Amino acid sequence: IFDAPQGLIVVDTGRSPMHAQAILDYAKQRHRPIAAIVNSHWHLDHTTGNFDIRQAFPNAKVYASTAIEGALVGFLNNGRAQGDKVLTDTKTSEGQKAQLLRGRYRVDHPDTLRPTNPVMRSGRVTIAGRRLEVHLAKFAATEGDVWIYDPASRTAIVGDLVVGLVPFMDTACADGWSKALDEVAAVPFQTVIPGHGDPMSRADFLSWRKAYNDFVA
């Protein structure tokens, strides 16, 4: 979460109600509105909370790539049959069912998943009055991944281009992902915030990039 002159900038909003509520609680504690959301990519564990936040702050802008459009008619739509199996499986907990239905509702009502301000190319962008470097990586972890470099804090927020676990390849292009990691390495960051896992130093990131390239070689 970034401070900006016009309010808070939230990068990714999580999946569960607890994720969204934690963000809303933080805004309340700070006595600041949420002015903008940046979605690093369309995966529902990064975007489902858009609905909750925009209910509370309907004027919040959403910055994201347009890759959600292909996902809605492709990956997310194709996963519906698998979701039906999970919902009818007696081993599925009520909590898991509620989470799946929450995500499905967002897919069926996708307005809050779509960007109000589409990111079409990399460049410097003023978001809620704060100047940030917004990058678009095409055909990487998804068809369009958005990552941010903040020169003031020398922090790169990269979504699932970096994760603490094994990379999720189901929606990925391995070569494009490797190129995106090279683009991240080219900025003078001190800290990387991954899509999952703990913050990384530059040395940690370079080690992860090498492991990724070895993994897909």
Name each model feature, range by range.
Residues 131-188:
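Active-site-proximal loop/helix segments of hydrolase catalytic cores
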Residues 149, 155, 175-217:
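Divalent-metal (often Zn2+) His-rich catalytic cores of metallo-beta-lactamase-fold enzymes
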